[in-house]
């Protein structure tokens, strides 16, 4: 691998695309060589995202116009259902032997094609690649990510749920049949396309649950937790939309196994993430806040004793656009290419 890698971002006109550009622009080993947005092809990136107007960036283009012979790494930030054929063509094409890809859509997260079809409403069109794709929860799957050519970047809610839960399940500290995840996200999680439910007057000054019992991140969470314990795990998961731009707070209600409590759970999480750059377990009595991770790749986890004996409440916060999407994708890229994992991701949270 040369000193710098040429990167293409597919779907650069969305929020996750803009975050990829913002973060990669300061990555010392990356050259942004191609930015695609088919509906905005020919426009300057600054006309779409003026806050990044000071950067020297390529003009937005179509995917077909990219010189793939010059690209080393691809971030795919396109909607689910659109990436399977595109990624298949890239990896099976003349330059597929050298390309590495991080896909931010849901298309390669679920390992079972029938589960994907059930939740996303259509058959998977790249089943062989689906089998090959590595789930990119970096702190959990680092070794497999390092050798992958296709990584499926986890969803925002699944990241905030699995990071605290997987170490606890692996250690046998919680009952896998008694997990309730109450998650709240900022409006950017709905994407940048015009939708009535994302309008200011629809979101501001209120909060509501959505996808109750039917959200597509439920099976993604269950897949990861089931792998952690070696048997099927079902969770109760309900997301809520908050009147803020960024951030996710997952409040997770648990039943500790015999002999365990909030203290042993906190100790286990602290030990599991002691050497991790981006995951921090906060001290007893501290409740993490979304404003404390805004704009960063950090995750904060709090562990609290419930008033009901034997029950524990875990809270986890992240920026849904960074660790919940683009930041974790870059973290995966760093691992895939053998770069220091924190490269380009060491910025501190924005506050206030």
Curated annotation (Swiss-Prot):
Offer a single GO CC term for the protein. cytoplasm
Keyword check for Cytoplasm, yes or no: yes
What is catalysed by this protein? Answer: N-acetyl-L-glutamate 5-semialdehyde + phosphate + NADP(+) = N-acetyl-L-glutamyl 5-phosphate + NADPH + H(+)
Q: Name one GO biological process term.
A: L-arginine biosynthetic process
Q: Which PROSITE patterns match?
A: ARGC
Q: Where is the active site?
A: 156
Is this entry keyworded NADP?
yes
What are the alphabetically sorted keywords of the record? Amino-acid biosynthesis, Arginine biosynthesis, Cytoplasm, NADP, Oxidoreductase
Pfam families recorded for this chain?
A: Semialdhyde_dh, Semialdhyde_dhC_1
List locations, semicolon-separated.
Answer: Cytoplasm
EC number from the UniProt entry: 1.2.1.38
Q: Which InterPro entries match?
A: AGPR_AS (IPR023013), AGPR_type-1 (IPR000706), NAD(P)-bd_dom_sf (IPR036291), NAGSA_dehydrogenase (IPR050085), Semialdehyde_DH_NAD-bd (IPR000534)
**Pathway it belongs to?**
Amino-acid biosynthesis; L-arginine biosynthesis; N(2)-acetyl-L-ornithine from L-glutamate: step 3/4
- What GO terms are given for molecular function? N-acetyl-gamma-glutamyl-phosphate reductase activity; NAD binding; NADP+ binding
SMART domains of this UniProt entry? Semialdhyde_dh (SM00859)
Sorted alphabetically, which HAMAP family does this protein's record hold? Answer: ArgC_type1 (MF_00150)
Q: Hey, which family's this protein in?
A: Belongs to the NAGSA dehydrogenase family. Type 1 subfamily.
Task: Quote the function comment for this protein.
Answer: Catalyzes the NADPH-dependent reduction of N-acetyl-5-glutamyl phosphate to yield N-acetyl-L-glutamate 5-semialdehyde.
What is this protein called in UniProt? N-acetyl-gamma-glutamyl-phosphate reductase
Which gene underlies this protein? Answer: argC
């Amino acid at each position: 691998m040369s000193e710098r890698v040429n990167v293409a971002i597919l779907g650069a006109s969305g929020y996750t695309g803009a975050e990829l550009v913002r973060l990669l622009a300061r990555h010392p080993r990356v050259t942004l060589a191609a930015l695609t947005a088919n509906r905005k092809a020919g426009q300057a990136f600054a006309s779409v995202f003026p806050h990044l107007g000071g950067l020297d960036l390529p003009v937005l283009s179509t995917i077909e116009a990219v010189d793939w012979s010059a690209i080393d790494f691809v971030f795919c930030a396109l909607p689910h259902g659109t990436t399977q054929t595109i990624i298949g063509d890239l990896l099976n094409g003349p330059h597929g032997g050298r390309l590495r890809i991080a896909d931010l859509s849901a298309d390669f997260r679920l390992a079972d094609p029938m589960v994907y079809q059930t939740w996303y409403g259509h058959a998977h069109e790249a089943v062989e690649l689906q089998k090959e794709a590595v789930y990119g929860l970096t702190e959990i799957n680092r070794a497999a990510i390092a050798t992958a050519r296709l990584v499926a970047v986890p969803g925002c809610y699944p990241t905030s749920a699995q990071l605290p839960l997987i170490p606890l399940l692996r250690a046998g500290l919680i009952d896998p049949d008694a997990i309730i995840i109450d998650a709240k996200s900022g409006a950017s999680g709905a994407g940048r396309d015009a939708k009535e439910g994302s309008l200011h007057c629809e979101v501001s000054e209120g909060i509501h649950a959505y996808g109750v019992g039917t959200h597509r991140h439920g099976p993604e969470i269950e897949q990861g937790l089931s792998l952690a314990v070696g048997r099927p795990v079902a969770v109760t998961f309900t997301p809520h939309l908050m009147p803020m731009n960024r951030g996710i707070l997952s409040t997770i209600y648990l039943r500790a196994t015999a002999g365990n409590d909030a203290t042993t759970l906190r100790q286990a999480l602290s030990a599991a993430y002691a050497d991790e750059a981006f995951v921090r377990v906060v001290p007893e009595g501290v409740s993490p806040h979304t404003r404390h991770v805004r704009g960063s790749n950090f995750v904060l986890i709090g562990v609290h004793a419930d008033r009901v004996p034997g029950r524990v409440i875990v809270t986890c916060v992240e920026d849904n656009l960074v660790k919940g999407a683009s930041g974790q994708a870059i973290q995966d890229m760093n691992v895939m290419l053998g770069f220091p994992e924190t490269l380009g991701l060491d910025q501190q949270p924005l506050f206030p």
